[in-house]
């Protein structure tokens, strides 16, 4: 299945509702990549999705490239803003964490390899006009 949706959000409440709808279609294991300008809401979306998977205390990963949270569904939260990504990075840093049921939430990620064996979701956030309105383009490949 491959589907693309476009969602306009005008408030934090709209963002939370978007996350609630997204959570309903995520099938673990899953890779969710997020891209958008600084301050566009990537971390907010990650935190809201993480809460729905039972992880209530995740931090912004800006100073740590990969954070692992153990639970019923393990969460790997990545922030690649300052990272020098190459295939070895994924093999060495990410692959060892992929045990049990898991979800990867990867911010600033335009180069995370797609995995044909799991659900791949790409989220692109576009700041519309400086008023706080954003457009979220979501592509789901299952």
Outline where the language-model segments fall.
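N-terminal pre-Walker A segment at the start of P-loop NTPase domains
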Residues: 1-21
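Short phosphate-coordinating micro-motif centered on Lys-Gly-acidic
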Residues: 3-5, 87, 95-142
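Phosphate-binding P-loop
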Residues: 22-29
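Short hydrophobic/aromatic beta-strand immediately N-terminal to the Walker A/P-loop
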Residues: 31-33
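P-loop (Walker A) phosphate-binding loop of NTP-binding proteins
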Residues: 35-37
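Conserved lysine of the Walker
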Residues: 42
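Short beta-strand-centered segment that lines the nucleotide-binding/catalytic pocket of NTP-utilizing
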Residues: 55-70
């Amino acid at each position: 299945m491959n589907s693309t949706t476009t969602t306009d959000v005008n408030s934090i409440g709209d963002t939370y509702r978007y996350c609630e709808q997204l959570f309903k279609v995520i099938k673990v294991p899953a890779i969710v990549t997020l891209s958008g300008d600084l301050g566009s809401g990537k971390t907010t979306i990650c935190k809201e999705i993480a809460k729905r998977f039972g992880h209530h205390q995740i931090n912004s990963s800006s100073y740590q490239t990969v954070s692992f949270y153990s639970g019923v569904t393990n969460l790997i939260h990545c922030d690649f803003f300052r990272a020098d990504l190459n295939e070895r990075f994924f093999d060495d840093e990410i692959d060892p964490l992929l045990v049990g049921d898991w979800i990867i939430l990867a911010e600033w990620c335009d180069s995370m390899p797609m995995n044909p064996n799991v659900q791949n979701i790409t989220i692109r956030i576009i700041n519309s006009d400086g008023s706080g309105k954003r457009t979220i383009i979501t592509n789901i490949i299952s």
